[in-house]
Amino acid sequence: MASEEGQGKTYHYFKRAILALYSDLKKQSAVIDELFAKAFAEALKQGKLNSAVFKLYRENFGKETKNSTLIKVHKRLGVLSDSGGFIEWANNGNDGSATCFVLRDKYVLTCHHVVGHIVGEGVEEKDWALIISHSARVTFSYEDKYPKENSWFSLAPWFEISDKHLDFAVLKLEGDRSLFPAGLVQFSYPLPFNGLIYIIGHPDVQAKSADGCTVVPVFKRKRECHCHIQRDQKGVCNNVKCGPEDRQCIHMFTQRSFQHVINNPNVVTYDTSFFFGSSGSPVFNADGQLVAMHTAGYKYKKNKQLHSIVEFGFSMVAILAAIKKNYKAWYEFELPSLWEDAGSCPGEHEDFTSAYTNDIEMETLE
């Protein structure tokens, strides 16, 4: 590399002698030159300085380098992923799917709104248990092809542990306990302030997969949401760009739309490619510890493609604290390894009642 001074700045370029020795490097240099030429031309159209282009590529490259993951973490996530489940239901024309994971023994955790979709609208909660048992089933082996009939577990007519505000529900598996995957509750850990997280679930009724995401820190949530809205609301609003449904339009969101997420200490926010069907997915930190359950997000359509302003999951610490507070007998009996050490868990949580788009998949009846 050689350097050249100009207007108080230093620019680096490859010496021709070095490029002559490495033909592949010469090709890559040409690609980079072309890339920056296009970027400079676009910056000129937008009235931006060339320095803004350099800043942009520095930031993008920095983000990519920080997404690297140790192999030992990949191996750990591979083991933990065995406990992630695919839950599907068919209830009198009401079909859908979502994600869940084994909490401990025969109990699985998923979102309260998922269970709400299983039972359908207008059903009293006292009748939910029976409908869940008749309509839904769970498998942990959907990793490639759609599982065979002998790979599924039924759900017991049991619905006793749930919370609408933290959007969680505990369901009970039926069958041979020796065939259930290991529970994840003992790996629960407080939310990370920043860094990487990994979601393992079944987006879009697909086989089990993982998505690495960057945490949006609490102090950046408001800015990230507002910048996202301002950037994409500049375009014209029409059916082609925003979709035919009002709720899918970026222009429907305002600065007040995200207050309950922005100011909620019990959620972790991030940007993920997991959309429909991923509610109930376990969320792990960079060390493979269970920090949250993926819940929902604010989505919109742009140019016929689905995008998200922000996605979030509720803290496992908050979920366990709510179970301990409201269902203490069950907590102490079913989670004996935790209740003696859980005194430091926060027992209170903020109300969370804003409307949001749930990440579940509902089939369209024709």
What are the functions of these language-model segments?
Residues 60-64, 71-97, 102-105, 109-276, ...:
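Serine endopeptidase catalytic core focused on the charge-relay Asp
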Residues 3-4, 23, 159-162, 175, ...:
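Intrinsic disorder/low-complexity signal
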Residues 9-13, 243-252, 259-268, 273-275, ...:
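C-terminal subregion of chymotrypsin/trypsin-like serine protease catalytic domains
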Residues 1-98, 362-365:
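Protease-domain processing segments flanking chymotrypsin-fold serine proteases, especially trypsin-like
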Residues 11-13, 22, 57, 107, ...:
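Sequence-level detector for tyrosine residue identity
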Residues 20, 34, 38, 42-45, ...:
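Polar/charged alpha-helical tracts
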Residues 1, 16, 42, 168, ...:
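Residue-level detector of intrinsically disordered, flexible termini
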